[in-house]
Amino acid sequence: NKIEFQKNYGWPKASYGEPYGQKKGQPIFFKEHKKNGFQEPLFAFSKAVGISELIHISNNFSSFWIDNFLISSLWGQSIYRMKFDENFERTIFFEKIYIGQRIRDIKYHNKLNAVLLALEETGEIGIITNK
């Protein structure tokens, strides 16, 4: 979501994800945000993908990726490319890019014009370029 002043997004009481590591007697998540007085998410992964980071990709990276965001994931072992409308009110593009490893971190490197991935299992650095 685009964070707005004095909006309540429900954390930690509301989520479309599933609780894990929950102790007996702890309340479960509210699944309906609006009904419980919380701001609805702009986009939700249902089944959770284990988001590790979200970055805005430089418009210099590719003419096809203008104003795009990349979301790295642990459980999903993928990068998710998203684009929102100009007011950040709806998703207008979504693409899953399968990597095959848990992605611990993702960064855009200006000088290399590349996306760098910290891959968990091998400890390698993945590099995505537009070439």
Predicted regions span which residues?
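C-terminal amphipathic alpha-helical "assembly" element
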Residues: 106, 113-116, 125-126
